């Protein structure tokens, strides 16, 4: 189940790097949850060919992520955004000038670290 979720996420990032047939098969298999037999019937292709396409695409998507890291970078940006929002919220309730400066410094460090 976890692998299916991972591949679905990678499809969101790298779908356009696949051929039209690969996109179609992956869409049917992962998003519409069709079996290999159902996909092979729809595409007039052997079940083994569909299996091979899915395996090849899985490897391609993982390789793209290893090289480009788009999913990982996006996850880091979301984390940085959450940290910055939390620090800004802390600033709203800070009456102490030192706390204010420290929070600003934390925000700067977060921006430098993640962005």
Curated annotation (Swiss-Prot):
Spell out the disulfide connections.
none
**What Pfam families is this protein classified in?**
UPF0122 (PF04297)
Which InterPro entries does the protein's record reference?
A: RNA_pol_sigma_r3/r4-like, UPF0122, UPF0122_fam_protein, WH-like_DNA-bd_sf
UniProt xrefs under PANTHER family: UPF0122 PROTEIN CBO2450/CLC_2298, UPF0122 PROTEIN YLXM
Function, as annotated, reads: Might take part in the signal recognition particle (SRP) pathway. This is inferred from the conservation of its genetic proximity to ftsY/ffh. May be a regulatory protein.
Family, per entry: Belongs to the UPF0122 family.
Q: What is this protein called?
A: UPF0122 protein NT01CX_2214
Q: Organism source for this protein?
A: Clostridium novyi (strain NT)
């Amino acid at each position: 189940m976890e692998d299916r979720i991972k591949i679905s996420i990678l499809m969101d990032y790298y779908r356009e790097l696949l051929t039209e047939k690969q996109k179609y098969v992956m869409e049917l298999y992962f998003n519409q949850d069709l079996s290999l037999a159902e996909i092979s019937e729809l595409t007039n292709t052997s079940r083994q060919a569909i299996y091979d396409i899915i395996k090849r695409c899985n490897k391609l998507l993982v390789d793209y992520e290893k090289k480009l890291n788009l999913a990982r970078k996006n996850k880091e940006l979301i984390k940085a955004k959450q940290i910055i929002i939390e620090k800004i919220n802390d600033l709203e309730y800070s009456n102490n000038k030192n706390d204010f400066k420290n929070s600003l410094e934390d925000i700067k460090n977060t921006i430098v670290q993640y962005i």
